[in-house]
Amino acid sequence: MLSVTAKKRILADIKNVSNDDIKKQGIFYSMNEADMTKGTALIIGPADTPYEGGFYFFGVQFPPDYPFAPPAMTSLTQDGITRFNPNMYREGKVCLSLLNTWHVGERWSGCQTLSSILLSILTSVLVNKPIQNEPGFETRTESEQSHVYARMVLHANLQTAALKMIQSPPEYAADFYDTMADAFNKNKKKLVDLAVGLQEYDNKTETMDFFRMTITYKFSTVADKIRDCVPRNPFPTEIE
């Protein structure tokens, strides 16, 4: 059972994460109307990273003793193949010091908020050279492995996090779909350009043994599908 302190703090965090300044950075949140301790967060991948224009969803679960313990977070944007980031596991685990799921870096304290967690993911996880987040690879950002991994993530970002999410959105995306459609239309040309710029890799297979990933690129096909995609909200809307 939630304490009065936990209820007040959760509501305050939700209000804070829903303000315009946070939304301008591509961060959005929807509370579960049946259970305020549960919710879904959306981070739109930042420009100039392999995550650009992708829709990255996270399940949020506040604990009964919030804010004395951090919320639990689950990475929902998955394709079953790609390790989208060293901090985001295929099974959904989010490895972050603020969540007390990683031992290096700033730990959770009661002064932290849901906003600070999501901003940390935006700025420290969804980065230009994601391999730098893997222990032992911090100084190997210009290595061949770094470039291969970033390319694999970008392909999955375009194919799954951007295109599939807008064409076949899961139920948890319902509250965000109009925002997603606006972002997709705004970013469409850039997403197509990113795919076209790497079409020389079409039909080439690359492997990242460290993350157990193998991918055969289809950048031209992805570019065509993004170019032709017209977002249509599949979720029923209430008629007043």
Residue ranges and their predicted role:
Residues 1-54, 61, 65-240:
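UBC/E2-like fold recognition across ubiquitin and ubiquitin-like conjugation systems
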